[in-house]
Amino acid sequence: MEKVIITGGAGFIGMNLALYLIKMGYIVSITDIKTPRCKKLIPFFRQIDLLEIDNLKDYFKEISPDYVIHLGARTDLDGETLLDYSANIDGVLNVIAAINSTSSVKKTIFASSRLVCKLGYKPLDENDYLPTTLYGESKVETEKIIKTSKINSDWCIIRPTSIWGPWFGIPYRTFFDAVRSGYYIHPLGVEVNKLFGFVGNSVFQIEKLLVAEGHKVHKKVFYLADYEPINVLQLAKKIRKSFGLSDFIFQLPLIILRIIALSGDIMKIFGLKNPPLTSFRLENLKTNMNFDMNNIIEVVGRDLPFTLDDALDETATWIKHDG
């Protein structure tokens, strides 16, 4: 049975991935600076800071993993300087050092982010970056470190897109809660289509990348998403129906939403961490979002385990009973 270390295993994707790999028969070890909310994962958990290199190396040597999935990172947008994201820069250097100190590792998957490019921007290639946030800049540094380092295993980079599902938090849990409660307001007359990813499909894709032949994934970058764009207004209607509600969605002209978003920006300046709408979120909301998924389809295949309706039902059930 093959052994996997998941850094950031107490995060949203990390917990779902750990549960999936355990179910698939892997020997899973997870590490994070925080304890997993999912109590089933406590026996598999070790609290380790990515910035504590000696502890990290000792942990890797103790486990002797066949695979490493590096999800650990600071992911919020609240940092004031790039130094605030040291977990994404020094942290990845330490993970690489830990991998290189452990001869057992056959393959490593490193998580980056779609925010290495601004929303709506289509990069020319995997080395074309255009971040607009400090978090995005930190993930550009993450990728550059990986691509220029000597790593004693096959490796690839994943860029999760808009991933949602059980155990999620800001921003997509906020979106679901707003839609469910009737507070979500869609821009009137604006059609927005985006690639989202249900986390059940995302962990399926990650495991397929993990076991793929090395030449198919080594030194490549893969976006993580479901394959068909979803109309955001129709998604909001489906979310309401998954909770047994009417599919009515309130809509307002874009100019009014801009005023509300500016109010949210001001609230954030004065210390409110999570206002309902900001200019950044509005820009995200109204921007079509598509990515080149051809390379991951070539490795994983086109068939994913969850349809949109299945995914919504599973997420609604989790929110009602556990979330």
Name every feature range the model reports, one short phrase each.
Residues 4-24:
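N-terminal Rossmann NAD(P)H-binding glycine-rich loop of SDR-like oxidoreductase domains
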Residues 50-90, 120-123:
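NAD(P)H-binding glycine-rich loop region in Rossmannoid oxidoreductase-like domains
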Residues 93-134, 156:
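Conserved Rossmann-fold NAD(P)-dependent oxidoreductase catalytic core, especially the SDR/UDP-sugar
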Residues 132-156:
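Active-site Tyr-X1-5-Lys
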Residues 168-174, 188-211, 219-223:
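Substrate-positioning beta->alpha
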Residues 199, 260-303:
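Conserved C-terminal active-site "lid" loop/helix of NAD(P)H-dependent oxidoreductases
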Residues 212-276, 309, 313-316:
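Mid/C-terminal beta-alpha module of Rossmann-like enzyme folds, strongest
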Residues 291-323:
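Amphipathic terminal alpha-helices
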